[in-house]
Amino acid sequence: MTVVPAQQTGGGGSSGLYDVLELVLDRGLVIDAFVRVSLVGIEILKIDVRVVVASVDTYLRFAEACNRLDLEAGPRKDPGLPDLVGEMTESGARGKSKGALSGAAETISDAFKQARDDGGSERETSSRPRARKAAPSRRKEEQE
């Protein structure tokens, strides 16, 4: 009697850890999670987790496709507490400097108005022209 060994029918056969690791690195395994907890517009908690088991090329292709190369860049970046404090300080200083400049301009304007008013009242009261003062060098010459 002859014995025929049983042939394996089905899947690709046995594969070792090396084959599995090569497949994962080639295809890539990326677990990407972004969680943000806000209360009344104030960010309380921000969790950004990215677990990548892939080759560098695979990860860079994934990040470029998902536009996740730099998480904190772009127009959708929320300002953090240092940014908010800096903006408030800057806007407060800008408001104070605008107030100081407008106050200075108002003071100068008032001074010019007052000078005009004083000059106009002097012109009305004095009908004769003012005498011209001689220069000090001419006076010395005349005295000699």
From Swiss-Prot:
It comes from the Bacteria. Transmembrane segments: none annotated. Induction: Constitutively transcribed at low levels, repressed by argR. Its main location: other. It is found in: Gas vesicle shell. One of its GO terms (cellular component) is vesicle membrane. One of its GO terms (molecular function) is structural molecule activity. Keywords: Gas vesicle. Residues 113-127 have a biased composition (Basic and acidic residues). Residues 72-144 are annotated as: Disordered. Belongs to the gas vesicle GvpA family. The gas vesicle shell is 2 nm thick and consists of a single layer of this protein. It forms helical ribs nearly perpendicular to the long axis of the vesicle. Gas vesicles are hollow, gas filled proteinaceous nanostructures found in some microorganisms. During planktonic growth they allow positioning of the organism at a favorable depth for light or nutrient acquisition. GvpA forms the protein shell. It is not clear what function GVs perform in soil bacteria. This is Gas vesicle protein A1. It comes from Streptomyces coelicolor (strain ATCC BAA-471 / A3(2) / M145). The lineage of its organism: Bacteria, Bacillati, Actinomycetota, Actinomycetes, Kitasatosporales.
